[in-house]
Amino acid sequence: MIQGFKELASVCQAIATGQQSVLLRKAGIRETTSESGFATKSFYLLPTHYHEKDAKGPTADFQISVRVDVLRSGDLLDWSKVEKLLPLTAYDPKTIREHFDSRDEKLLHFALIQPFSLSPTWNLPHSPSLSGCRSWFDLPPPPPNLSETPVPATEAVRQTALLLS
C-alpha cells in the first residue's frame, strides 16, 4: 500500500532542500498516542497548510516532490531535546510546544528520514478522500515516469542525527 503523510508545505520545502531531516508529530484527534507514531517506513509528503479547512476557495492539488524513508523513529519525552531540534527544522516553535503539551502524556513522535526528490513533481488531484485533518492517506500508484534522487545531507541533517542518537 502506498502511503502519503500530510505535512506543512514549509516543512516539505525544508526537507526537499536538505535543511531538515526529522518529522515531528503528535497524536491526531481520532488517534491514541500509541497509534500515532511512524509505523510506515516509506511514504510521500503531501504539502499542506495548517488547518486548510479554514482556506477560502477550492483546495489546490497536491504537488508532491518528496518521498521519504524512515531511518529511525521514536518518542521525544523531554522538552529540552525538542528545543535543541527546533532550530534545525522549519516548524514553528510555539506550535510544536502546544503539540507537546496537548495530551496528558507529554511527548512528540519523531522520524529521522532520508528524503528523495521526485522528478517530475507528482500532481495529485485533491479529492474528498484526501481531505480533513487526518495525517495518513492511502495514495494511488505514482506516475510511472517518476524518478527519485536522494537529497544530499547537509550540516543540519548531520546535527539532527547526532541529537537523535
What are these model-derived regions, one by one?
Residues 1-165:
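Structured alpha/beta reader/binder surfaces that contact nucleic acids or chromatin modification marks
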